[in-house]
């Protein structure tokens, strides 16, 4: 009876993912195969001058792959999934729920169109949650009057949009996504009302897009809000004063929608920028938001989302609160992380951007180890913990406190005070960015901040509801994909090589399993060198007559074949289980290689350069838009090149090298030495088959997205140079 009572009290349940017995059997046999491969390499080293250097290089690469494989198993051993009971939350707390401050970050009105940003803003304003308890803050690091204008338009449209969402309980509550998904369908409301709201939205979007195209705001619009007076002709995105404007004051009697319900508070912030001070990128913006929001609303829960990551599930706040307010476990939980999902994925995931295996397999495994990663968007934090509070068994959060009382200050006075919290000099000689708030000094400020929270004793929870909580825009070109993964791999590798290395910083603070889990991503960049070696040297060995694998009829070929086949089949199983298609998995294998020889390689090089003081940290925004032709090719699942990027030269060189070497290898097999070189021919052939779209882009396609002739010529030159390598 006691157990039943306890179970009834719980606001969430934790369930183990099934199929572990089969997985562990597979892992054990693969581990045995890997040990046999390493033993073979160690005991069959050729004499000097007989391909010894190439053999030792292969052994080193395989040793690295073995170590990395062991690390990746840490998140597959015992994954869990979470289930919440929102009905119990409603029964227990009714309207006595904590306030929530929502942070949305943008930086460039051209890379991140304001019309996209405000759809995200409107979606988080429309949560199935008391509006008076929601405060939404937009950080505009570009300090653009265009973004402010778009937010002002959104504040007007919200008066009609929020009642519409509540009245018909629609999903999603991003107007752009809703009208795109429900085109021509309006079963929940009358066609007249549906068309009316849709027309209002489209007219607003056209006004915003027109202003962005012209770069100007109509003078009559500027007269409608005092905030437009903050801008002058001398301001730039890198040099401007702090701006804080409250567009909707949730405490004002006038802040109501068309149904008379209270509107959420809506605030625009552009922190001060000056060439004399480092602004610390997104981390600096988030810390400024923490301070400004503490003055205006000071809610105990903070949600941060990227500007393109709209709310797709209006119950996400309530799901997160099931963890924060659970009587038995809430005192341990520092943040609740939702997965990243995208609404612009092609059917077969042409660029491997779906993150399905990471979302459905790896993050669940990290959750079981005591903490999934903080990934910088779709994450609910407890304010005090984000601000540096250490874990204590006796600590109890005061969830009952409401939105901060204002006293006798009017909104203009609040705005002026808030500006002083968003200056360049406020953080000087303070612990902001170190012990307080989001951490500085790393391109992936989110991961290192989450690691610090875990090392202070807090756990985190990974919540994957049936309806995706947040949906965003994935890179739609190869260049954007490479850039995004270069930034991720560089940032995580920077952490690995810093004092925050999880094995050092996390020793005695977090479990070994979680330390290894962090290293899966921390070592992405380090995977580049052994991968490049493995996709080039065996191919060159075919041309130069250097065998690098056991003969195909030898018993020692068995562990090589077994490890390769079982690992490949299990990766296919994970991909299909996570929602990928067979072709999507195959595309993922291609992108696995492409990212390792480009994104991860550049991330590795740039990290080493920074450590040597040869370069400084930078942050490049992944564009959220692409032109019409690029978008069409993306929908047709055609790889996008189109420029003479050095990364494309690497891709073309590897593809062309393996093609030429395969032809040479086949001639050797026809000459009667198939038993010796067949393993290398098979490896080379698989790389060639994987790269068929690359050959098409080099020699067949005529569209603007093909590989340019200079890239093809450069790759031919590098292939010729590769044949001069003495290593084999």
From Swiss-Prot:
One of its GO terms (molecular function) is cellulose synthase activity. It is a multi-pass membrane protein. It is found in: Golgi apparatus membrane. This is Cellulose synthase-like protein E6. The chain crosses the membrane at residues 21-43, 53-73, 523-543, 546-566, 646-666, 669-689, 707-727. Belongs to the glycosyltransferase 2 family. Plant cellulose synthase-like E subfamily. The active site is at 141, 446. One of its GO terms (biological process) is plant-type primary cell wall biogenesis. Keywords: Cell wall biogenesis/degradation, Glycosyltransferase, Golgi apparatus, Membrane, Transferase, Transmembrane, Transmembrane helix. Its EC number is 2.4.1.-. InterPro entries: Cellulose_synth (IPR005150), Nucleotide-diphossugar_trans (IPR029044). It holds the Pfam family Cellulose_synt. Gene3D superfamilies: Spore Coat Polysaccharide Biosynthesis Protein SpsA, Chain A. GO terms for cellular component: Golgi membrane; plasma membrane. Thought to be a Golgi-localized beta-glycan synthase that polymerize the backbones of noncellulosic polysaccharides (hemicelluloses) of plant cell wall. The keyword DNA damage does not apply.
